[in-house]
Amino acid sequence: LRIDRTLKAETDPAKALQAVGAVTLGLDLTLRDLQDDLKKKGQPWERAKAFDGSCILADWVELSEIKDWKDVHYTLHVNDELRQKGDTALLIFDIATLLADISQVFTLEEGDVVMTGTPAGVAALKADDQLTMTLHGQSQDFVWKTFVQA
């Protein structure tokens, strides 16, 4: 979710949702070996989460393409094999409620990105893996292809 206007302490989920300007799919990558090593040492994990290329974002899709926030499906294929399948109907908290709750804790500013979670299917990627992310919109599908760089 791309935030297009400041959102602070909003208690009305419908109003919170109005701060969203566009949606996309993203991959929030983790260097698991480094993360495990940092955990064993009792150190923070940010080096395993914040590295060059650690957050792949597809192109933004305008909200006019999303008619029903409760019926958005998305998939990730790795080398043409289905790896992850998600659906906004399966989120613990709907998107509007999630945004309102976040805005109670800290201010969301224009340009901020909110990622809503990861469906089952997390697994290691290898150099040159071909990734296909698909956002199944109500009027059309949006497909992005990329690959894992060494």
List each model region and its residues:
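Catalytic-core "active-site belt" of small-molecule-metabolizing enzymes
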Residues: 1-105, 109, 113, 122-150
